[in-house]
Amino acid sequence: MTGTTRMKFLIEQEVLLQQYETRQNEHEVMRLLHPDFVEVGRSGRSFDLQSILELMKNEEPSTGKIHSQSFECIALEPSVQLLLYKSAWVDSKGSTSLYTKRSSVWVFTGEKWQLKYHQGTPCEPFRIEVESTI
């Protein structure tokens, strides 16, 4: 897999995890998240895999969505990739809030890529790009 192909694939996986339908499918979440997964949310709270699964299970559908943009992929090792990007919450009326800088560490387990670490940090508002891909 080339660097560009890997980056596109990891972005697709990251965006999948932002979708309510994916988050309600425990089998799919387990495919995407590493058993040792840890998240530090934008609130500063830490979550492990079990607490994230519980949160996702109890999540209610929403009329808004997460918009992601400005992706950058940095190879820490061939099997460890750091994905950086910005996100914002877009409500059903198109208003934006919860501007966040995000970082995700994806690891290749020998069989598949899994998200091992994710962190969201609040940031200043930024201009929303129409295209959210590379």
Residue ranges of model-derived segments:
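A beta-strand edge to alpha-helix "cap/lid" segment located at domain peripheries
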Residues: T2-R31, D36-I134
